[in-house]
Amino acid sequence: MSREIVNIQAGQAGNQVGEAFWRMLLAEHGLDDAGMYKGNDPQQIARAGVYFTQVDSSGPTKYVPRSVQVDLESGVCNRLRSGPLGQLFRPDTYFTSDSGAGNNWAKGYYTEGAELIDGILDIVRRQCEATEALQGFQMIHSLGGGTGAGLGSLLLSKLREEYPDRMLSTFSILPAPNVSETVVEPYNSLLSIHQLVDNCDLTICIDNEALYDIAVRTLKIKSPGYKDLNQLIAKVMCGVSTSLRFPGQLNGDLRKLGMNLVPFPRLHFLMPSFAPFYDPKARTFQRLSVSELTSSLFDKKNLLVASDPRFGRYLTAACIFRGKVSSHEAENSVMQLQRKNSNLFVEWIPDNVSVSLCSVPPVGQPQAAVALANSTCMQELFKRNLDQFALMFKRRAFLHWYTGEGMDVMEFTEAESNTQDLISEYQQYQEATVEEEEADIEGEQ
């Protein structure tokens, strides 16, 4: 039986990345743009029910995404409706308005978003009612704007209230340190992080700077556009969900993934990586061994987040290998990597790297691997954000845009101190040793 996931894509970035994700998902499951099965391997659709609802009124079965598309502007969703995937989504799963959130978190969370949230929740409920064993939700959004960040945060808190025992996971696109879209990004993203810490079980962090580097350095794209970057995010999203969508032996659902990756509930921010990324011109000359694939996964160049794992320690990680890879090889190469870099892995969590295999490779590649890592170097991201936030907040810059929407200055202070706490928790576990952890556990008992 498929344990279903409801996908929610919020805001401009969420819907554009969502489109790339669904396109790749269709290709992997042998479905065409209208959701009709065109493949020849029954394994392709054995567990397609995780993300798709099957509709067979009369004639062949159509696979419809279990998805909700939300935006406070209608432009991106209209393009989705009239684009190649126009026949794919159910028309009643779109929710748009024309008010816009103007890159203002408070508009998305308090004013515009709060007026519309009930209508959005109705669509989500309808999708949930049509499932047999809902495992949880995944949200695709960016943290720098108004809709994905503000309305996305509001939606998460409502889902947490209404479905307290279901997994909430997000693919959250953080503002890039060097590529700024709007001046108030530091406010929007810190207010969102504050919400994600409390209302989410798994947050997979992605930032545009790291994506841009991969596109330029590795893929040799001269001036990458969002379409190129979204393609990279979709690769990782499909890779991460492999063990949910195809028969496999480990991390078969979101909760198991969470149990293996999140040792402390607040520290659920994960770094994704993918291998191999390579220049399409050189692909015919490349075939990586399993140990090369493994070391690429833990290499800064293959991370979709601009942080350096050498400055932190891995609490946990999950590696997913796709294609013809034997479990013996995969587990051996991960063990060797841990042995060689033992200082980068905490020693007080035994067996902290899980390995799962999927025999179905990504479309157009003989093999690939993806990893999700919970590393203390994630604090770099939050520090960077906090510093930019503090610079503006100290001068009370642009604060009137937020207080004008009914927000209290106290909320900014709370978000700041919650993020400071998060950073010091990461630091504490980075420096912890086996003895300290054992003492802590005994103390708690």
Curated annotation (Swiss-Prot):
BP terms from Gene Ontology: microtubule-based process
Localization, UniProt: Cytoplasm, Cytoskeleton
Signal peptide segment: none
CDD domains in the cross-refs: beta_tubulin (cd02187)
Domain of life: Eukaryota
Residues that bind GTP: 12, 73, 142, 146-148, 208, 230
UniProt keywords, alphabetically: Cytoplasm, Cytoskeleton, GTP-binding, Magnesium, Metal-binding, Microtubule, Nucleotide-binding
Any GO molecular function: structural constituent of cytoskeleton
Binding sites annotated in the UniProt record for Mg(2+): 73
PROSITE patterns documented for this protein: TUBULIN (PS00227)
InterPro entries, sorted: Beta_tubulin (IPR002453), Tub_FtsZ_C (IPR008280), Tubulin (IPR000217), Tubulin/FtsZ-like_C (IPR037103), Tubulin/FtsZ_2-layer-sand-dom (IPR018316), Tubulin/FtsZ_GTPase_sf (IPR036525), Tubulin_C (IPR023123), Tubulin_CS (IPR017975)
Cofactors: Mg(2+)
Single GO cellular component term: microtubule
Coiled-coil region list: none
Quaternary state and interactors: Dimer of alpha and beta chains. A typical microtubule is a hollow water-filled tube with an outer diameter of 25 nm and an inner diameter of 15 nM. Alpha-beta heterodimers associate head-to-tail to form protofilaments running lengthwise along the microtubule wall with the beta-tubulin subunit facing the microtubule plus end conferring a structural polarity. Microtubules usually have 13 protofilaments but different protofilament numbers can be found in some organisms and specialized cells.
Protein role: Tubulin is the major constituent of microtubules, a cylinder consisting of laterally associated linear protofilaments composed of alpha- and beta-tubulin heterodimers. Microtubules grow by the addition of GTP-tubulin dimers to the microtubule end, where a stabilizing cap forms. Below the cap, tubulin dimers are in GDP-bound state, owing to GTPase activity of alpha-tubulin.
Family per similarity comment: Belongs to the tubulin family.
PANTHER family: TUBULIN
Protein name listed in UniProt: Tubulin beta-2 chain
Species the sequence originates in: Suillus bovinus
